[in-house]
Amino acid sequence: VWDREIPVKEMMEQALGLPVVLDNDANCMAYAEWKMGAGRGMSSLVCLTMGTGIGGGIVVHDRMLRGRRLSAAELGQTSIHYQGKTGPFGSRGAIEEYIGNNELAAEAVKRYAGAGIIKTVDECTPRHLDEAARSGCPIALQLWEDTAEMLGCLIMNLMYTLVPDAFIIGGGVAK
């Protein structure tokens, strides 16, 4: 944590000679997809980034959804299990407590151990789990099926709440 305010935006503008906007990755993804990508021409969309956590960027009626504190669309904090794991922000059952990179790896290690197979978290990255699933590994296949179910729960909640024109999914886990 920085102990003083650093004018990053102004420093970047001066160095680049261009206007700079600072935002989180999911909002930037949503804006780019809306203006130039898969969401071009749509008036509403939801972008989900799947990586270390689950991020979100939302466009509604041709406007980025920001919220009162500019922190709307923190979709990783959406609960999918009302009695689930308690996360670092105090919410229970937040989806990113189940399908973020680290959580997937930890769950895979646990499931492999239950089958008598010793794996480290470094051997259970999304890429490793993808390769294992493509090779027919039942543990990896079930883990991805469970991940898809949880992601589907989040998407259905968003669908019934926002009724967007599209959902666009990206990020390291999504690859």
Task: Show which residues each predicted segment covers.
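Short beta-strand-loop/turn "lid" adjacent to the catalytic site in phosphate-handling enzymes
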Residues: V1-I6, V21, A166
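ATP-binding/phosphotransfer module of carbohydrate and carboxylate kinases, centering on a glycine-rich
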Residues: K9-L18, A32-M42, M64, Y82-K175
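Generic enzyme active-site microenvironment
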Residues: D23, Y31
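Active-site glycine-centered loops adjacent to acidic/histidine catalytic or metal-binding residues
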Residues: D25, G51
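Short glycine-aspartate micro-motif
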Residues: L45-T49, G55-G57, I168
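A cytosolic small-molecule/anion-sensing beta-strand core signal
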Residues: V60-H61
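A short, polar/charged loop-to-alpha-helix boundary motif
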Residues: S71-G84
